[in-house]
Amino acid sequence: AEDPNTTKDFLIKIERFATTMVFDMKEWGEKDPVGLTSSNDAAALLPLMGIIMPEEPAGPVVKAADGAARITTFKTLTKDGHNPTLVPAITAGTLFTGVFSINISSTLKSTKFGLPYNKKPSKFSFTYKYTPGSPVYQSVEKDGRNHAVLVDDKDLDQCSIAAYLFEVSSYDETLDGTNVNTSSKVILKAELTDGTAKSDYQE
């Protein structure tokens, strides 16, 4: 017979996975499109290091007039025109799935890429257009500082769009900026092969 004075507590854990990843940019949080993470939090720290940021746009990733995400690369320099090696002279705007958690000792480890996914992806598609910077600068390290050097090659400035599928042994394990392009855990990669200027939206 059951003892009416005895109770048991059970903890039920439910795993939830995304079955469809669609990011249409229609809904935005305080800084980023819902479901995505940007480099905005990192850019917010740059003025604390003496970096001069432009007033427009307000950050590396903002909502454009047509509703798209506008991603901008900045020349991130101090008033005297250079930086310590901690900050590159050219800082690219980024938008990705995952989380941003600042790592002062290794800034590339601040981006923790990816979301748990337990389905076989059937396709990866996106819509974009791209305007290269003008003039074109390249970040060059010299004498322990990063400098923005003017480059004659206009084709050097191209956009980069890629999707990675990787296998890990636990949900706490992620890839970051130091290993996403070299890790053996990456089993599939889709990448834009033509990053040159596109004045109209491409799919």
Residue ranges and their predicted role:
Residues 62-86, 90-93, 98:
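Short carbohydrate-recognition loop motifs
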Residues 25-27, 74-76, 114-133, 140-148, ...:
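Solvent-exposed strand-to-loop "edge" motifs in beta-rich extracellular domains
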Residues 4, 8-59:
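Extracellular carbohydrate-recognition regions
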Residues 141-161:
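Short coil-to-beta strand junction motifs in C2/discoidin
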Residues 5, 16, 117-119, 197-199:
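Surface-exposed coil/turn segments at beta-strand junctions on protein surfaces, enriched
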Residues 88, 92-124:
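Extracellular/lumenal carbohydrate-interaction signature centered on repeated Trp-anchored short motifs
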Residues 170-203:
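Extracellular carbohydrate recognition and processing domains
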Residues 20-22, 66, 112-114, 118-125, ...:
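Extracellular structured ligand-interaction cores
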